[in-house]
UniProtKB/Swiss-Prot annotation:
This is (-)-alpha-pinene synthase 1, chloroplastic. Keywords: Chloroplast, Lyase, Magnesium, Metal-binding, Plastid, Transit peptide. It comes from Picea sitchensis. Its cofactor is Mg(2+); Mn(2+). It holds the Pfam family Terpene_synth_C. GO terms for cellular component: chloroplast. Disulfide bonds: none annotated. It is an enzyme of class 4 (lyase).
Amino acid sequence: MALVSIAPLASKSCLHKSLSSSAHELKTICRTIPTLGMSRRGKSATPSMSMSLTTTVSDDGVQRRMGDFHSNLWNDDFIQSLSTSYGEPSYRERAERLIGEVKKMFNSMSSEDGELISPHNDLIQRVWMVDSVERLGIERHFKNEIKSALDYVYSYWSEKGIGCGRESVVADLNSTALGFRTLRLHGYAVSADVLNLFKDQNGQFACSPSQTEEEIRSVLNLYRASLIAFPGEKVMEEAEIFSAKYLEESLQKISVSSLSQEIRDVLEYGWHTYLPRMEARNHIDVFGQDTQNSKSCINTEKLLELAKLEFNIFHSLQKRELEYLVRWWKDSGSPQMTFCRHRHVEYYTLASCIAFEPQHSGFRLGFAKACHIITILDDMYDTFGTVDELELFTAAMKRWDPSAADCLPEYMKGVYLILYDTVNEMSREAEKAQGRDTLDYARRAWDDYLDSYMQEAKWIATGYLPTFAEYYENGKVSSGHRTSALQPILTMDIPFPPHILKEVDFPSKLNDLACAILRLRGDTRCYKADRARGEEASSISCYMKDNPGATEEDALDHINAMISDVIRGLNWELLNPNSSVPISSKKHVFDISRAFHYGYKYRDGYSVANIETKSLVKRTVIDPVTL
């Protein structure tokens, strides 16, 4: 990876480079670009909640806009200082023994009925077991056992739901809600209409005034089920409203306990922003304190010990991957790019929260690299670069030739090379996994992405405020979701032949919706700070332009309603039981959407990364759990 040169750019040199036979436009633009050396910031970067605009004066006197973002929070010395002993073989051997014992626990549920598993509890025990290993983050070891358990449960599923066991006379809410959620997440065809059976004669979900622990747990699972809604499922919306209100009220009545903490976690994060490794970390705490588990026929101590071991063993791999990532960041010349945010550790954390299988290092590191580059480009196109420079950069990138960088301002050369080298590197990794060259395909995705940024840069420069439709279509591309996901998923041990890839990547509905939610949610968190930096166009401002008299609150209500619809659409694209594309092929694109959504849950967590995002890094990457 080439380092960024800080030597002055000889402007005339680019005039003598033959960029291509069709590059007359590049040469013309190049003549208009002044020499640009290292820039001087008018204000130092400190952690800022306002994301105010600072002025930067370059060596040639060009006034440049720059967001006042805080610096990288995770320096090399800190990353190198992290230590862990959980990479030792003894921990892996202990985990393997526990995996074998948990498999025996699964298999015992398939044997003849005994004292612990009977016709009166065989369904709820299977569903509870599957739900537990998934929430603890250890399900990858039990794929066959999970399928066998759910096939069994589904064989007894009916339009009335299920009871605790196959011989239960009446369906109960807890078994049906948890069964519905788990079956739907695994692609089984289950109708949400089954939840209507738990309404009273007035069409309302019924509950008792006493709010017993058993009932609270049932409503908690109803709430969890309601979040896996498909478009048009009114009963799911009703269930979500009812159960959320019920659970909020229950927190005022019950004592502080593992149950109250579980309720708080689920209400706080829902499903779309409850990233799997974060949920595993939280559920380890809850699971170990839950007295209800002692009533189960399952040996919960073994599940808990395995979950802790797996969490910490992966933690040792994270340390090695972080050390590599920080070296890559330094060697790429990124530290010299003072005009942009540096959030490579945060992006790696998001990737490791949605894909913590050891074999998916390429995905985690590829995602972190791609997102780091996207952030550099975002800050360059939105604030630092001039329109003439950005046009030159966009045209040069489409040539895909290192010599094209000779015509660029000095600060852009480093950006060009990190993008060029990294995309080529990930393409080589993808070729190993997929057995075919995907570089041209990836380049087209990056070309579209840069074109969308160029459009936005022109809007900023001219002060043009587009219509909502104009902004939305361009904004889905400039969100960066596609370029962040495409090459990382191609490095995985999941086959993506062309007919599958087009159902996951562009022009699929899954890709469109994933890009949409990133654009819309990002706008709701960033539009005020963007406006302060001179970036007027957002879904909020464009909606207000199209609807004279609409307030910001009206616009936000409209955008939030769109987001809710998009989430249900995403659920359908992932879990449609009639889809010809396996869930495993779509899952990581979907989960990337969840990861980005988490980053915008409270604020712009990529600009202000020193609050919730920092906590996520510490809890899921830096700190192991106590065995």
